[in-house]
Amino acid sequence: MKLQEIKDFVKELRGLSQEELAKKENELKKELFELRFQAAAGQLEQTARLNEVKKQIARIKTVQSETK
């Protein structure tokens, strides 16, 4: 993700409710699980996507803690 995409993503996250953030986090965790499974099987072509998803989950958790 480029810097502007990251800023837009975080801005979008800040507009969501806690329930929506939790739902988005769960979706990304499922995607991360699938990516790890593909990586273990040697089928993953976009290896950078693993780190991208991890960082997106961390951003969601940061926004969640900001709003508590």
From Swiss-Prot:
Pfam families: Ribosomal_L29. One of its GO terms (cellular component) is cytosolic large ribosomal subunit. InterPro entries: Ribosomal_protein_uL29, Ribosomal_uL29, Ribosomal_uL29_CS, Ribosomal_uL29_sf. Keywords: Ribonucleoprotein, Ribosomal protein. One of its GO terms (biological process) is translation. Transmembrane segments: none annotated. One of its GO terms (molecular function) is structural constituent of ribosome. Belongs to the universal ribosomal protein uL29 family. This is Large ribosomal subunit protein uL29. The gene is rpmC.
